[in-house]
Amino acid sequence: MDATKKLEIITSLEKLPDLLQALQNNPGVFIMKLGAEWCGPCKRIEGLVKWCMDQAPANVQCAVIDVDEAIEVYGFLKTKRVVTGIPAILGYYKGNLNYVPDDVVIGSDQKQVTEFFQRCYEKVKQ
C-alpha cells in the first residue's frame, strides 16, 4: 500500500466490536466525529470538520459517525462518560485499545475543533 495514500473516511461503526477493530487497525491516530443529521451544532462545524479531515496525513484514520445509526457505540461511550453530548470528536493515538480517547473536543467551538485536529496531526509527526 502506498504510504502517502489517504485512508477513506469510515462512516459506519455500529457495534462495539467495530470500534475495537478500528482501534486495533489505527495507523497513527484514529479520529471519530459523533454527530447527527438533526443536530444544529453538528451542522455548524460540518464544513470545518470535513476540511480538517481532508488535510489528514496518510497515517490518520477518520470516521464520521451518525449516533442514530450507532446507538450501541454512542450509548456505551455516553454511559462511560466519555461523551456528554454531540458533536463530539474523539482522538485515539496508536496503541490505545481502550474506549477512553487520548484527546477529545465536545461542542461546536471552531477554535477548539481546529486546535484538536492540530494536536492530533502534530502527534503523528512525532
Task: Tell me the role of every PLM-derived stretch.
Residues 10-14, 34, 46-74:
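Thiol-based oxidoreductase modules, predominantly thioredoxin-like and allied folds used
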Residues 30-32, 62, 89:
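Hydrophobic beta-strand anchors of alpha/beta hydrolase catalytic cores
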Residues 1-30, 110-126:
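N-terminal leader/targeting and pre-domain segments
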Residues 19-23, 74-81:
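Short amphipathic alpha-helix with an adjacent loop that forms part of the alpha/beta core around
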Residues 39-42, 89:
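The canonical Cys-X-X-Cys-His
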